[in-house]
Amino acid sequence: MSNAESDFERFLTIEHCGDLLQQECFDLAKTSGWWTNIATGERLHTEESETPRINVPEKLCLIHSEISEAMEGHRKNLMDDKLPHRLMLEVELADAVIRCFDLAGGIG
């Protein structure tokens, strides 16, 4: 196998893992109610044929808030309040990644 073939196979594996993470984060978010309008109970997630009914700027601000919380944890050298054995920086960065994959899953 050539280096180019090996690199391509590695890319396909990484792409597949990214797809799996995106779907897992999106499915978990739907199950957790992140894709339901709190006021109306309307389902906000879409099927492939539908136009997304989400507020993308709101979702981006939620990602930004996780990054801001990570910065605060780093600046103050804090442990996480819900996972006290982990640094707040680690947990908030993981939350930001989850929200990124969730948004990507939601907009297709």
Report residues per predicted region:
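Flexible "arm" and connector segments at domain edges
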Residues: 1-108
